[in-house]
Every structure is written in structure tokens, then in C-alpha cells.
């Protein structure tokens, strides 16, 4: 599509994400201090997340962060258990973390209402502060992302990641995490300027690819795969660097595109090893956050490893916008999709 890359809503909204996070951290500081104190008193034995689409990818990030930092078991609720099967699990003594941009999907609302009746403390991360979800939750954490017009979420997804980090930092009273998070907006601005055009050139005519990561980066990998589908009409599958060995790597052939994200934590060595192995099979491997022989290295910003997935997705959004245009598509208007999706 013959449009400048900065003319799309996706570009403008993703570019605005650093300022969104900056404002969000300030606006929610006292609110999350109170919530953190409540959670320390409650001592929940588990967290249950509930979300759809990009918000569910943020929930994947929440699982890894909560379990690694707080050692609290975190699992994902399937809304259909309540909204379709009309079953209500016992959620006494748990935190039910609902994440949504619109806060309006009927299945999400039905599940949240059931969770409250089942004894959970409901915390909602939601962009629409006057939404039904915000009204039914025990605690609401505004995403503060403002109006998002592009069908493909960007700044609201990043705002979900930063809200999760601020929530966990406040719950644990983790000053180091909160200090790292305070530096995120400036680092995100740097990440936006990085040149990922090598990925655009390699994926312009692709029909399939894997997006691979692990641990704290898995939710960002899931988000990237969705964005390839939504904005580029490109079939992409998100898979962990461990899970890909349990069957999926059988389809990786010479020239098969593989985009790998890595953060500099305990998972990096394994991710790099996989990248090296796939490149050795002559797959077209692109790596962000690590290096491997015979692969293309996409530049990243080094930071606290917990921030690196968010910084990578900030760079990714600019690339995927350019890729959509290069493939002749309008990233703001994917076919058959609407901004607010309501499922039952």
C-alpha cells in the first residue's frame, strides 16, 4: 500500500506508548500501593487470569512474572467454562485478574461475576474506566492508554504489560522492579528508533513463519504472531523454544522464516542454542535479543531483563506496520475484524 509508514493509526498509537506508560505509572502509583498492601494481607494461594486476544498475551506475561517474583501459582481461566458450560470453579482465596481494553465482552463479564460469587478478589486492568468490567471489579487499574482507533491493539497491550509490572512490584514491595520500570519510557523511545527493516525485507513475500521465545518473552511472542495475522495477512505461529522441539520444528525447512525473541535471563542460552540449530538447517532465522551464527540480528535495547520483552515489542510494532504496508495491506483495517469484539 502506497502510504507513508507514519500515516497509519497503528504507527501513531504504538509510537505514543512510551508517553502512555509514563503517565500510567504516575497516575496509578498510589492506587497500586493500596492494592499491593491488600494483596500482602490477603496472601492469595493462586492468581487466575481471564482475557482474550492481546490482553490474554499480556496475561501470559503476568503468569511468568507473578510465579517467578511472587511464587504464587497463576493459571488462565477459560471463559467458556462459565459462559457456555455454566460451571463455576471454587475460587475462594484467589485473585482473579481480568485484563481487557474495552471491558465489554459478555463472556469475560460473565466469568468475572461468577468469580466474585465464587470467592475471588477481582482485579481488573482495563482501558475503558467506565466499562462494565470496571464497575464489577473489586479493584480497577486503569491502563490510561487513551482512545485506540486501530483495530490492532498496540499501546493498550504495552500499557497492560507495564501495569502488570507495577502491580507485581507494588504487591511484593519490590523497589528494584519499580525503579527499573520508571526507566522504561525513555528506553521505549530508544527502542522505537531501532532499524528492523531487515525483517521487512525477509517477510514481505512470506506465507508462514514461527515466532519463538520463552518465559517472560512468551507473551510478546504470542502478541507478535497475532499482529502478523491481523495486519499483514501472514500466518504466524507462536511457540516456546522448548515446545517447538516437541513436534513443530519438523516443518522447519530451508528458507522457512523464524523470528526469535530473547531476553537476557535464564532462558537466553536455550533460545540462542535453538536459533543456532535452526540456522544450521538453513532456516531464515532472525533474532532479537540474542545472536546466532548464520542468522540476522535485529537490534534491541539492553535493560533489566523484565523490561526487555516490552522493549522488543515496541520495536516490533514499528516493523510490523511497515511490513503490512509493504505487503499492500492497511494495518488499521484488517478484514472481518472490529475494534471491540464481543464473544459469549
Please place each PLM-identified region on the residue numbering.
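Generic C-terminus detector
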Residues: 3, 302-344
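Active-site phosphate/pyrophosphate-binding segments
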Residues: 5-44, 139-143, 147-257, 267, ...
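Alpha-helix N-cap/helix-start motif at coil-to-helix transitions, marked by capping-box chemistry
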Residues: 12-15, 131, 313
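Glycine-rich phosphate-binding loops that contact phosphosugars or nucleotide phosphates
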Residues: 40-186, 214, 261-306, 310, ...
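Composition- and surface-driven signal marking solvent-exposed, interaction-prone regions
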Residues: 224, 271-274, 312, 335
Amino acid at each position: 500500500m502506497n502510504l507513508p509508514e507514519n500515516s497509519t493509526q497503528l504507527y501513531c498509537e504504538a509510537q505514543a506508548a512510551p508517553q502512555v506508560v509514563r503517565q500510567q505509572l504516575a497516575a496509578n502509583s498510589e492506587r497500586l500501593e493500596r492494592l499491593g498492601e491488600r494483596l500482602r494481607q490477603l496472601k492469595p494461594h493462586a492468581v487466575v487470569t481471564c482475557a482474550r486476544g492481546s490482553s490474554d498475551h499480556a496475561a501470559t506475561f503476568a503468569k511468568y512474572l507473578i510465579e517467578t517474583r511472587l511464587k504464587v501459582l497463576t493459571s488462565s481461566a477459560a471463559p467458556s467454562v462459565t459462559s457456555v458450560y455454566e460451571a463455576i470453579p471454587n475460587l475462594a482465596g484467589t485473585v482473579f485478574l481480568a485484563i481487557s481494553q474495552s471491558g465489554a465482552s459478555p463472556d469475560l463479564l460473565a466469568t468475572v461475576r461468577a468469580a466474585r460469587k465464587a470467592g475471588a478478589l477481582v482485579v481488573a486492568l482495563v482501558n475503558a474506566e467506565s466499562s462494565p468490567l470496571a464497575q464489577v471489579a473489586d479493584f480497577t487499574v486503569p491502563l490510561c492508554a487513551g482512545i485506540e482507533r486501530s483495530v490492532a491493539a498496540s499501546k493498550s497491550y504495552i500499557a497492560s504489560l507495564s501495569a502488570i509490572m507495577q502491580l507485581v512490584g507494588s504487591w511484593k514491595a519490590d523497589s528494584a522492579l519499580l525503579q527499573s520500570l520508571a526507566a522504561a519510557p525513555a528506553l521505549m523511545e530508544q527502542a522505537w528508533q531501532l532499524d528492523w527493516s531487515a525483517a521487512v525485507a525477509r517477510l514481505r513475500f512470506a506465507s508462514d513463519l514461527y515466532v519463538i521465545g520463552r518465559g517472560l518473552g512468551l507473551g510478546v511472542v504470542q502478541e507478535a504472531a497475532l499482529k502478523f495475522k491481523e495486519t499483514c495477512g501472514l500466518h504466524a505461529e507462536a511457540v516456546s523454544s522448548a515446545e517447538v522441539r516437541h513436534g513443530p520444528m519438523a516443518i522447519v525447512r530451508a528458507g522457512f522464516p523464524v523470528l526469535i525473541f530473547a531476553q537476557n535471563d535464564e532462558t537466553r542460552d536455550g533460545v540462542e542454542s535453538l536459533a543456532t540449530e535452526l540456522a544450521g538447517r538453513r532456516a531464515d532465522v532472525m533474532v532479537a535479543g540474542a545472536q546466532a551464527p548464520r542468522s540476522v540480528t535485529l537490534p534491541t535495547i539492553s535493560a533489566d531483563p523484565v523490561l526487555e520483552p516490552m522493549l522488543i515489542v515496541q520495536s516490533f510494532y514499528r516493523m510490523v506496520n511497515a511490513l503490512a504496508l509493504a505487503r499492500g495491506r492497511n494495518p488499521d483495517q484488517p478484514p472481518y475484524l472490529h475494534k471491540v469484539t464481543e464473544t459469549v
